[in-house]
Swiss-Prot record:
Stated name of the protein: Arylmalonate decarboxylase
UniProt keyword annotations, A-Z: Decarboxylase, Lyase
Highest taxon listed in the record's lineage: Bacteria
Enzyme class at the top of the EC tree: lyase
Origin species: Bordetella bronchiseptica
Length: 240
């Protein structure tokens, strides 16, 4: 049964199909989500440039469809031009809709801070250029990237085909390269990470913040109503 106290949560998603990311039904099966798709062509700066100017229009569309809060559910889309751009984009969405708005980059920052992670090992789906922009963004936000291991993927649909074993191995390699890290950021909203997160946390004993789960966590908190995720998906949901 839908929880009446929680308003509809609007999500701007990279794929053109405009579907609510699969994590939503697993984490918050009773909450109302709607989505609008940007049609991102590639997970590269050139791909982001082609769609970033339409984000505010998608936010307006979601507001007209009944959203009470809006999140841009793309991590690299919101960090690739830096911290000031992420903040300005959030303001532009809010001013255009009159709604509380957020981004996935803001979500991962909030998640890392909620878990006390300052020194962060990066495990990403990205190519090197995007990894460098992520590290610079985190540094602007007073976090310390300790190293990075990545998959080098540029295809939007390819992200969802990365299996759990590959994600666990990626996180383990990222942490083993920087074992003094406080935790791990598993970055890219297209990765399906819910099964990997608890396994990595069990193996390594450090928290994992992952883009899509953090995006849902952040948007639900912004919406209010006190909804809790189903248990078993990691420290971000269990401890914050």
């Amino acid at each position: 049964m839908q929880q009446a106290s929680t308003p509809t949560i609007g999500m701007i998603v990279p794929p053109a199909a405009g579907l609510v990311p699969a994590d939503g039904a697993r984490l918050y099966p009773d909450l109302p989500f709607i989505a609008s798709g940007l049609g991102l062509g590639s997970v590269t700066p050139e791909g982001y440039d082609a769609v970033i100017e339409s984000v505010v229009d998608h936010a307006r569309r979601l507001q007209k469809q009944g959203a009470a809060v809006v999140s841009l559910m793309g991590t690299s889309l919101s960090f690739y031009r830096g911290a000031a751009f992420n903040a300005a984009l959030t303001v532009a969405m809010r001013e255009a809709t009159g709604l509380p708005c957020t981004t996935m980059s803001t979500a991962v920052l909030n998640g890392l801070r909620a878990l006390g992670v300052r020194r962060v090992a990066l495990a990403t789906a990205y190519i090197d250029d995007v990894n460098e922009r992520l590290a610079a963004f985190l540094a602007e936000e007073s976090l310390v990237p300790t190293g990075c291991r990545s998959l080098g993927i540029t295809g939007v649909e390819a992200m969802a085909r990365v299996d759990t074993a590959t994600l666990v191995d990626l996180c383990v390699r990222a942490f083993e390269a920087a074992p003094d890290s406080d935790g791990i950021l598993l970055s890219c909203g297209g990765l399906l990470t819910l099964d990997a997160i608890p396994e990595v946390e069990r193996r390594l004993g450090v928290p994992v913040v992952s883009s899509s789960p953090a995006g849902f966590w952040d948007a639900v908190r912004l919406a209010g109503g006190g909804a809790k995720a189903r248990p078993g998906y990691g420290r971000l949901f269990d401890e914050s």
